Amino acid sequence: MLNSYVVREVSNDKLKWEYEFAVDKKYFLDQLDSKLSEIAMNVKVPGFRVGKASIDLVRKEYLNEAMTSVVKKTIESTSSDFVKNSKFGEIISSNIDIVSYPSYYSDNDKEEDLVYKLSFEVMPEAPLMDIDNIVLSDIEVDIQECDVNEFIENLKKQRPDFVIVDDPEYVIQGSDKLVIDYQNKIKGKILRGGSAKDFVLVLGKGVALREFEDQLIGMKVGESKTFPLTFPNDYGMVHLAGKTTDMSVTVKSVYVMKGMRDSEAIAKDYGFKDVGHMEDFARKRIKQQFDQMVFTIVKKELFDYMDANYVIDVPECVVTQEIAKINKEIRDSGEDIQIDVEKEAIKRVKLGMLLIKMSRHNNITIKNEDVFSFIQSNYADYGVDIGNVLKMLQSNKNFANYISGKVLEEKVINYIIGLAKKDKKVMTAKDISLMFENI
């Protein structure tokens, strides 16, 4: 194959290359004749035994099929031979445009060869970050008495005192506690797990779907109602996700909020030995919450440092994919987010390349326990059924790739944070919250 083709560079723009290949006409036609002979040996032509039809007849019937096969094979072999010997690195996108075909029935050697253009984009080698030059904040939260009191007040709000409503004309409000019966159907069939009797629901707590609670507001004790209810696509119960059902509800009792209970009653209600143990629990939970905020803040510091101190040519095709992801994130959020999408996409791709380089250089890999821990902290702790997440992990390749990428990213970030120089700070919970909100 060494002398069967010649290559001419058409363009070279950073990571994007284009070459024109001219495959020698004689070489190509020899390959085509070989393919026709192969077909002739195996094809059954009406009036002939297998392999006994003349080559002229086979050529007449199967030339186009053979031409297509040989063109494909020739392009694959010549382009891969060239790329392999040229050592471009990792090619992440490519395209073939055929310019001309040789004529099988012409003896004129001056007629065109098989000519095609190969354009491709390569993934550049990212530099290895020098962790010794990185200085990150080491923030310790100063938990004050007001923070503990606020936490306990929130506990009280979760379990206020309620008193039953005796007035049959009372209209349900958005903070009432209800006892209801409900039943879910699709096309008249009761759904598994979609019905309950004497179900206790406190409105406004985010326990039920907002659309469901909205239908209950304005009803009265003893009233029944049937309405369509559409479950979100990411609903925890997979068999209901994305479906519209006929929901029937009967209100059996209504309770209105009377007031907040004192700290001793709340401590007992939550199972604490006394108020002191509840306050100790509050400090631990506050620290956990703010440790996660601090991690996000420090990660932002690290990303800003990486973005400011490393200049990399990023592949256009990867940036295009990232732009599509960001636009989808914005649409799914339902918020009016104003950002330079292309700039954000370029930054994400660059940071990803730097983190991948760091992971490969230091042999940082992910294990099953890393994935499970990530799912626990990012899904299960927020009420999502971990079993459903694990099923998606096995059945949805895109979701599995997303989780793997996030887990590896977090592991590399923790590795860098652990080795970077530290600027120790003690900050109040309020100040940390303000920093977190401004990210």
UniProtKB/Swiss-Prot annotation:
Picking any one GO molecular function of the record gives: peptidyl-prolyl cis-trans isomerase activity
Does the entry feature the keyword 4Fe-4S, yes or no?
Answer: no
Cellular component terms per the entry's GO annotation: cytoplasm
Q: Which UniProt keywords apply?
A: Cell cycle, Cell division, Chaperone, Cytoplasm, Isomerase, Rotamase
Tell me which residues make up the PPIase FKBP-type domain.
175-260
Quick one: a GO biological-process term for this protein? cell division
- Would the keyword Cytoplasm turn up in this protein's UniProt record? yes
What is stated as this protein's family in its record?
Answer: Belongs to the FKBP-type PPIase family. Tig subfamily.
Task: Check the record and name the NCBIfam families matching this protein.
Answer: tig (TIGR00115)
Purpose: Involved in protein export. Acts as a chaperone by maintaining the newly synthesized protein in an open conformation. Functions as a peptidyl-prolyl cis-trans isomerase.
Q: What is this protein called?
A: Trigger factor
Q: Per the UniProt entry, what species is this protein from, by scientific name?
A: Ehrlichia chaffeensis (strain ATCC CRL-10679 / Arkansas)
Per the record, the gene is: tig
